Amino acid sequence: MFIQWGRRFFALFWLLISVILFSSYAYAEQGDKEAGKKIYEVRCLWCHGATGEGNGFAAQFTNVRPRDFTMGVFKFKRSLPGQIAADEDLFRTISNGLPGTPMPSWKLVLSDKEIWNVIEYIKSFTDIFESDKASGMVDYKGEIPYSADSVNKGREAFKKAKCYECHGENGRGNGMKKLRDDWDNREWPRNLAKPWTFRGGNDVKDIFTRVTVGIPGTQMPSFASANGLTEKERWDVANYVRSLVDETKRPVSPQTVLRAKYIKATLPNDVNAAEWNETPSAAFKLFPQLIENDKLRGFRPTNDSVTARVLFNEKEIAFLIEWDDRTKSVPGDPIVEKLSEGEVFEDAIAIQLRVGPPTAVQQPYPGHGDKTLGVEMWYWGTGNTSGGQTIKMIDANGLGTEKRRDAGRINIKGTGEYKAGIWKVILRRSLTTSNTHDDFQFERDVLIPVTFANWDGSNGEKASQHTLTNMHWLQLEP
């Protein structure tokens, strides 16, 4: 009897310890508002503003507007649909941050107690927490394990709920709807192929939560209503969404070298040729180009990465550059003009190479080079409805010094295709040219500095207002 009781005691004891140590759920604590105010004024005021209206000085430069606390509406929560956010929801957001936004993770800077103090102060910006309280949380007991069967059922439920109208048939966010949130900010549907950009978490439970609760203040509704999806269907949709991940779009570390593959055959002209599938790829994160005066204000890039593959033979080199883009931006196209906030420019991509000996390892400034180290850029654009695709060759020694050269004279060729929310563009040229002074000469087994620049024309991007990668290394196989 004593032995049985002892076993039960220790089993319960270790169960309790496991819950305490490994649970990701934070239980609410009563914070100190005055202590939270002091932290807020040092850490949070610059974006969220002195009165919590999301209008701090830095807000004008952010790609996603800071939360307006005075409305009491919080996007990412586990409290039930129609209920206000629970304190635990605010704790989770402050602790983990929101990927793809200026909201950082604070858990390595602030203690749990300090975060609870900040929450208590944030809640004082509205009286909604005085009269209301979350009374229930999303229940995960009915979770359906990930399987091919669940994914297939989720695909059908995705269609049933018409998720494709915003997220697109393949989940790339290219549903061609013009969306605005409750603060009248332009919103773009989430690209479901990039779960690392999901702001409220990206495991199956997190996705189930978003489908169940929705995202308050946005066009993303709750599908838990009577005419929405059943609990089982929502779990299947969550598994289906998780299956859409495209790992070739996940940005690599800055130290990653882009490897160019050698083939004896003629280089492919088709962006979907089988040779590209057998070529190493690397995805690079895009950053806003720093531009002068007040142009940076309100510039909120929509494309966040490019993926590159490179093939070469004895005579030529070819780059296949791929990126997800919610719109095919062609000036003069009435469909994309309805989606845009202003004038539509061409979608475009450019490769930037340093001018000079291939064996030199100095890196020029990623944005159009600098006075010391010049660059050449191979530019491809969509053109407009009355003309063909644009191909340019540009030399530069810094912003404002660009000089265009005839791309045809050095035999730069390009072609592009847009399909299901994805651009694929090939740019190619001979490995060497007769103009060794002005043209970059490719050599094998050396590190070559390379940068990629991207323009989303429906987002008002043109000239120096665009995104670009950091400088990375390209190496042709020895």
Identify the residue ranges that each predicted region occupies.
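Electrostatic cytochrome c docking/interface patches
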Residues: 25-39, 129-159, 248-254
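Bacterial N-terminal signal peptides
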Residues: 11-22
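Long, compositionally biased interface segments
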Residues: 428, 436-478
